[in-house]
Amino acid sequence: MSGLFITLEGPEGAGKSTNREYLAARLREQGVDVVMTREPGGTPLAERIRELLLAPSEEAMAVDTELLLMFAARAQHLAQVIRPALARGAVVLCDRFTDATYAYQGGGRGLSVERIAILESFVQGELRPDLTLVFDLPVEVGLARAAARGRLDRFEQEGQAFFEAVRQAYLQRAGQQPQRYSLLDAAQPLAAVQRAIDALLPGILERCRG
């Protein structure tokens, strides 16, 4: 069995974490070695960087600082978790990866795709996800779900225009590479979203065992 790198992307309140758990359980039922992780974070050091990125602060974080911290956490995560898991043949399910950087720092913050791509190449080399599930939903629905969870982090405190730009960046990337992305309607009831995941399962298992 070869390693497979699957990322789950989408804006706030899209249900990525819940559906990551669901997909992991379905794969494990088939005897697949699954590693669940997230970004920013995934290792003790990367989780400390995550805290810096998400905690509201009186000092405004420069956009380049935010971008570099994202990739610093990613470099540690790749070295300690993702690359070793793929090398042993595991399926890695990651809640957010570099597509989130293109969506949030690119779409939301307005950084150029070229600027992000330089860091992507430097930190990741040739490594890219094999499959990316994009959980899409209207911004107002996602923000309402995020607010219902309680205290908002630094990103969740951004306004609707920011998240509209994030959403459009995700949709644009998915449209450019349909062979890598699967777009799921996350505004549906959870059971319907998970039926859509089930429909992808045979193809994922075939790639695992191919």
UniProtKB/Swiss-Prot annotation:
It catalyses: dTMP + ATP = dTDP + ADP. ATP binds at residues 10-17. Keywords: ATP-binding, Kinase, Nucleotide biosynthesis, Nucleotide-binding, Transferase. One of its GO terms (cellular component) is cytosol. GO terms for biological process: dTDP biosynthetic process; dTTP biosynthetic process; dUDP biosynthetic process. Its EC number is 2.7.4.9. It holds the Pfam family Thymidylate_kin. Belongs to the thymidylate kinase family. NCBIfam families: DTMP_kinase. This is Thymidylate kinase. It comes from Pseudomonas entomophila (strain L48).
